[in-house]
Amino acid sequence: MGLLTVLKKLKQKEKELRILMLGLDNAGKTTILKKFNGEDISTISPTLGFNIQTLMYKEYKLNIWDIGGQKTLRSYWRNYYEENDAVIWVIDSSDIRRIDDCKFELKKLLEEEKFAGASFLVFANKQDLDGAMTSEEISKYLDLEQLNTHHWEIMSCSAVTGLGLEEGIDWVVKDIVSRCFVLD
């Protein structure tokens, strides 16, 4: 293998990003990925364990790990904490009764040293439903303004309509690239 081939492989590897997608069960993590990938979203079942979706976005290969959010699976989340460039936390904006549970799990997640420096996107999902909290309300309730350990953004979205999905992924990729790569 020649030096040029090795350099090309290294360059391709640089353009590969690992993103961890977490949130409580029924937040819409799998639906977001399927919608973004142009797949059918009419029959989604709960994720038992994890799914890995590889998406091409601009010139980047995104390996997105979608981890089930059921209470019985949350203790296993830490098995996926290594070497992530970003975390996407998905919230069901219409499920006000579980916002305290969401805040508790998010706080534990943000205390993990393995995520230090990772880009952090909160998708305020299900904005298409009546009574959904706004991204501003969620940000305030979750105290995101106090978050100074990560680059972060909150984005309103709907996995059903596609609202905000591309903008969110675009922010994640740009934030990772601005921190990790020297632009050509």
UniProtKB/Swiss-Prot annotation:
<keyword id="KW-0342">GTP-binding</keyword>
<comment type="function">
    <text>May be involved in trafficking events within the endosomal system.</text>
</comment>
<feature type="binding site">
    <location>
        <begin position="125"/>
        <end position="128"/>
    </location>
    <ligand>
        <name>GTP</name>
    </ligand>
</feature>
<dbReference type="GO" id="GO:0015031">
    <property type="term" value="P:protein transport"/>
</dbReference>
<protein>
    <recommendedName>
        <fullName>ADP-ribosylation factor-like protein 2</fullName>
    </recommendedName>
</protein>
<dbReference type="InterPro" id="IPR005225">
    <property type="entry name" value="Small_GTP-bd"/>
</dbReference>
<feature type="binding site">
    <location>
        <begin position="66"/>
        <end position="70"/>
    </location>
    <ligand>
        <name>GTP</name>
    </ligand>
</feature>
<dbReference type="GO" id="GO:0003924">
    <property type="term" value="F:GTPase activity"/>
</dbReference>
<keyword id="KW-0653">Protein transport</keyword>
<keyword id="KW-0813">Transport</keyword>
<dbReference type="InterPro" id="IPR027417">
    <property type="entry name" value="P-loop_NTPase"/>
</dbReference>
<keyword id="KW-0519">Myristate</keyword>
<dbReference type="GO" id="GO:0005737">
    <property type="term" value="C:cytoplasm"/>
</dbReference>
<keyword id="KW-0449">Lipoprotein</keyword>
<feature type="lipid moiety-binding region" description="N-myristoyl glycine">
    <location>
        <position position="2"/>
    </location>
</feature>
<keyword id="KW-0547">Nucleotide-binding</keyword>
<dbReference type="InterPro" id="IPR044612">
    <property type="entry name" value="ARL2/3"/>
</dbReference>
<dbReference type="GO" id="GO:0015630">
    <property type="term" value="C:microtubule cytoskeleton"/>
</dbReference>
<comment type="similarity">
    <text>Belongs to the small GTPase superfamily. Arf family.</text>
</comment>
<dbReference type="GO" id="GO:0006457">
    <property type="term" value="P:protein folding"/>
</dbReference>
<feature type="binding site">
    <location>
        <begin position="23"/>
        <end position="30"/>
    </location>
    <ligand>
        <name>GTP</name>
    </ligand>
</feature>
<dbReference type="InterPro" id="IPR006689">
    <property type="entry name" value="Small_GTPase_ARF/SAR"/>
</dbReference>
<dbReference type="Pfam" id="PF00025">
    <property type="entry name" value="Arf"/>
</dbReference>
<dbReference type="GO" id="GO:0005525">
    <property type="term" value="F:GTP binding"/>
</dbReference>
